[in-house]
Amino acid sequence: MDAACSTQLIDGDGVFNVSGVDHFIKEVKLDECGLSYAVVSIMGPQSSGKSTLLNHLFGTNFREMDAFRGRSQTTKGIWIARCAGIEPCTVVMDLEGTDGRERGEDDTAFEKQSALFALAVSDIVLINMWCHDIGREQAANKPLLKTVFQVMMRLFSPRKTTLMFVIRDKTRTPLENLEPVLREDIQKIWDSVPKPQAHKETPLSDFFNVEVVALSSYEEKEEQFKEQVYNLRQRFFQSVAPGGLAGDRRGVVPANAFAFSAKQMWQVIKDNKDLDLPAHKVMVATVRCEEIANEKFSSFIANENWRELEEAVQSGPVSGFGRKLSSILQASLSEYDTEATYFEESVRSSKRQQLQEKLLQLVQPTFQDVLGHLRAGALENFKNAFEKALDAGEGFSSSAKSCAQSCISKFDKGCEEAVIEQAKWDTSKTREKLERDIEAHISSVRTAKLAELTTLYESKLNVALSGPVEALLDGANDETWPAIRKLLRREGELAVYGLSNALSGFEMDEETRSKMLADLENYARGIVETKAKEEAGRAMMRMKDRFATIFSHDSDSMPRVWTGKEDIRAITKMARSASLKLLSVMAVIRLDDELDNIEKTLTLALFNSTGNNATSKSISTIDSLASSTWEKVAPEKTLITPVQCKSLWRQFKNETEYTVTQAISAQEANRRNNNWLPPPWAILALVVLGFNEFMTLLRNPLWLLVLFVGYLVSKALWVQLNISGEFQNGVLPGLLSLSTKFIPTVMNLLKKLAEEGQAPPTNSNQSMNSTAQSEVTTNGESSSSSSSGSSPAKNVPIDTSA
């Protein structure tokens, strides 16, 4: 393989060989050299032996002129090759010769363009000239030097280029004598070249380092020529070191940008524009650094480690996220630094910053996802820890504070692990969001817990007050409301004390705490008021129950039997008085221990003013009930208005009137059932009309004995048959019942008499006593049976539901 890799850089028509240059750089591995490379070019008249010199000096294989075929143009355009065996890497450019007949005298454009290109690209420019031209006014090298100096004015280069004049076919004149003459000629040419105003007085030494070497004739003294070339070759080793031939490196572009830089320079030169090398260097650095940055960005996106990390973050927090991502980012930035290290520092740094910003912009959503996972995890941990702390019985505020501090501390630690070295991202907003979420959860839990506590103590108050208040109102009397007030005060204090102790762990402000306790007290009061309103709605039923209880039961709570001895008027008055007492108790709410005259007003208006003969005073009192409010009672405390009381009392009297009437009827019926004597007129008639029969009995006492025996038998049958009891159920049922019992009873009685008659005479007295005792016993049994049988007749049913 050709080690020099000779390649045409620019053809004779001025076309830049892009693919050829890329192939050349790849073959000679120029892009790996960084800034450690040098470019040497050679100028000179056509057929002056430039290619021959380069081939011997640098080991290249440029095409040389065949002298046997005549002198003609050999090199067309610009060729490039690598020097063999010289370090650092040295690239040689062989330029088309000047003053060639092929282009003619007027076609000097390519000469100037190639000269300008060589000066812009090269560190060292060899100017090949004949020894016999030194000192001549019309020498062949003067147009070349004028061209070099003229184009130099268009470069604006910050560095000095080494111009090495190679004197060919040296004569016997010593070099020490030739060099001053050559330098003088060079200075004259420099002075004659038009310059910009800024460089009118600028010496040649500010632009060029001038070196002069002489070589013997290759054709006449080949061995001496080769020896001199070998010695010259040694000067190109380490040429880029300080003090070397190419020691000024200020305008050098990195080797990996050489092809792009050369192409852009040639394009500017062809467009006949001034070539500002510093600006060109910046441009090259900008383009190449941009390309490198884009490559590294694409490489980062395709990085397997980054993809795995990004995918892992989607499912949850990743341990060591910041460290892993920082390592991947640093690797990409380090690769950029390695490839862009030789470019303009300001451009390199700027593009590096842009690359870093793009990379950070790419990874920031993933970083935010990590923060989101950390925040969600911290919030969930807080909720669990907070719930466990509350279940363990710890104070609400202390639990909330300790759990919040612990979870936020863990979140901060997670953020520290997630933050990457290359970015100074602020996690405070996420932290603030977490704090707000925690505070919102604490607030919601506090609200729920306070609601639970309130509900708990309200339910306790419901249980403690509802039943007892209902029972107290059911037995309404003068002590009802004092007992209710006492109950309300006791249960309210217990509930407030319990709630106050429960609230101590919440660290509430005093105003809120006092309001909650006051609300609980009001709730307890509301329970009593609500229950009182419910009972007031059932006032009529309660009054009728009270009336029925007192009217139908005696002082021993035994059912009352209307035997005819009871004072129904007094009992009715007592029962209605008790019902009126109940109405007065239920008329208003008395939780503030305030005095009122409701009972007195109702008594005067409703109880004492009965009948149609009411006095004018009573009428005035009744009129006082024609109002919707009670005197000295707030409307909100009124349960039953005076007008409603009047209406209720009227309805009450109407519905209880039937019960009283039933009692009176039962009493009258009982009296009739217990009175067996005929009316007085019947007794008088019996005396008048039965006088003769009575006298007959007196005249014949035997009839008295018969009547007495008949009386005893009748009495025994009366008792045995329970005639009065049977007829209490009705005449027809009584007759049917007696008809079935009569014969067995008579037979039983006769049997007993027969047994008495068969008794021994000695026991006559005993028999008489036994008979009397049996009669008494029979009477007692009959009486008892009569009593039990007559009981239903005496107990007249009372309709209390009316």
From Swiss-Prot:
Q: According to the UniProt record, what class of enzyme is this?
A: hydrolase
What does the UniProt record report as the effect of altering residue 575 to V in this chain?
A: In rhd3-1; reduced root and root hair length
| Residue span, GB1/RHD3-type G domain | 34-249
**One annotated Gene Ontology cellular component of this protein:** cytoplasm
What GO molecular-function term can you cite, just one? GTPase activity
**What spans are recorded as compositionally biased (Polar residues)?**
760-781
Q: Does the keyword Transcription apply?
A: no
Topological domains, Cytoplasmic: 1-677, 723-802
Bias category Low complexity: which stretches?
Answer: 782-791
What spans does the record annotate as topological domain Lumenal, numbered to this chain?
699-701
According to the record, the residues making up region (Disordered) are: 757-802
Q: Which GO terms describe its biological process?
A: actin cytoskeleton organization; cell tip growth; endoplasmic reticulum to Golgi vesicle-mediated transport; plant-type cell wall biogenesis; root epidermal cell differentiation
- List its EC numbers: 3.6.5.-
Keyword terms: Coiled coil, Endoplasmic reticulum, ER-Golgi transport, Golgi apparatus, GTP-binding, Hydrolase, Membrane, Nucleotide-binding, Transmembrane, Transmembrane helix, Transport
Instruction: List the effects observed when the gene is inactivated.
Output: Reduced root and root hair length due to defect in epidermal cell growth and enlargement. Reduced size of vacuole and increase in the proportion of cytoplasm in root hair cells. Strong reduction in the cell wall thickness of fibers, vessels and pith cells in the inflorescence stems. Reduced cellulose content and altered composition of the cell wall. Altered organization of the actin cytoskeleton.
* Stored InterPro entries: G_GB1_RHD3_dom, P-loop_NTPase, RHD3/Sey1, Sey1/RHD3-like_3HB
Tissue pattern of expression reads: Highly expressed in fiber and xylem cells. Expressed in roots, cotyledons, seedling hypocotyls, stems, pedicel, stigmatic papillae cells and anthers.
Residues given in the record as GTP binding sites: 44-51
Coiled coil, from the record: 214-235, 429-449
The residue ranges crossing the membrane are: 678-698, 702-722
Q: Which family does it belong to?
A: Belongs to the TRAFAC class dynamin-like GTPase superfamily. GB1/RHD3 GTPase family. RHD3 subfamily.
The protein's job, in short, is: Probable GTP-binding protein involved in cell wall expansion. Required for appropriate root and root hair cells enlargement. May inhibit vacuole enlargement during root hair cell expansion. Plays a role in cell wall biosynthesis and actin organization. Seems to act independently from auxin and ethylene pathways. May regulate membrane traffic from the Golgi apparatus towards the endoplasmic reticulum (ER).
Would you tell me the protein name for this molecule?
Answer: Protein ROOT HAIR DEFECTIVE 3
Q: Which organism is it from?
A: Arabidopsis thaliana
Which gene name does the record give? RHD3
